[in-house]
Swiss-Prot record:
Pfam families: CBM_1, Cutinase. The gene is axe1. Keywords: Carbohydrate metabolism, Cellulose degradation, Cleavage on pair of basic residues, Disulfide bond, Glycoprotein, Hydrolase, Polysaccharide degradation, Pyrrolidone carboxylic acid, Secreted, Serine esterase, Signal. Residues 1-20 form the signal peptide. Glycosylated. It comes from Hypocrea jecorina (Trichoderma reesei). One of its GO terms (biological process) is xylan catabolic process. This is Acetylxylan esterase. The active site is at 121. Coiled coil: none annotated.
Amino acid sequence: MPSVKETLTLLLSQAFLATGSPVDGETVVKRQCPAIHVFGARETTVSQGYGSSATVVNLVIQAHPGTTSEAIVYPACGGQASCGGISYANSVVNGTNAAAAAINNFHNSCPDTQLVLVGYSQGAQIFDNALCGGGDPGEGITNTAVPLTAGAVSAVKAAIFMGDPRNIHGLPYNVGTCTTQGFDARPAGFVCPSASKIKSYCDAADPYCCTGNDPNVHQGYGQEYGQQALAFINSQLSSGGSQPPGGGPTSTSRPTSTRTGSSPGPTQTHWGQCGGQGWTGPTQCESGTTCQVISQWYSQCL
C-alpha cells in the first residue's frame, strides 16, 4: 500500500512527463488540500454518518464553497442492541481516540487547512475530550493530556458542541439556559486550553447536557442555534480561509441529518473515509489514492 509520500512522488513524476518541467511538490500538496475541512460527530444510537451535527456542517459547506467534510467513525453507542451493545464508556473511549486520530492525520497531510469540529451529544463529548484533554474518568479516560498534536490544535479554528454531556455551568464558552451540568460534567474550575475556539450549546430542559426532562430540547440545537454557530465559525476562520465558488476541492455530497448513514458515492474522494468498524460507505478510493487504515474505527483515502 503506497504511502502519502509515494503517492505524491507518483503525481510529481506524472506532472513532469506531462509538462517536461519539474513541479514543486509543496505546490501539488497545497492544490489537493482544501482551505477548510469540517469534522462532524453524531449522537448516540444514530447510524454511521453525521447525525444531528449535519445541520451546522451543511451551513459551513454552503457558506464556504470548496469546503470538505467527513464524519468521525465510532460506535456512538450506549449499550443498545442497535449499535452492537457497546457500552457508553467504551464508545466514548473509542470515539475520542478516533477523533484525535482523524484530526491529527488530516493535519499531517494538509497542515495549512483550517479545521472545524461539530459534535452533537456523545459526538460533542468526544470532540471535547480530544480538543480540551483533561481526561474523562467517568468513562475510563485517565490520561489528562490533550490527544491532539500542537499543530492540529492550532489548525482547529472553531469547535461547536451541542448537547455536550461534559457541560458544566460557568465555562466561558457556554451558550444557552442551563445553569447546572450534564451527566458526565467537567470538574468545577476546569479550564480548556482552547476555550476561545469553542461554543457549547445547552438549554435547561435538556436531560443529557443539563438536568432537565425534555429529550426534544436535546435534539433542537441545530435549528435553534445553527445560524449563531455559523456566525461564530465565520468569525474564527481567517479571511483567506474560504475559496470562491468553483475553486478547490469540493465535498461530493452534503451530509444529511437522517438516522441512517449517507454514502458519498461509489468511490470515495481524496481524504474521505473508506473504512472502519461500522462504516457503511464506499470502500474504494478514487484514482490515485488508496484506502489506508488509521485505526480500528477509521480508514482514509490517501
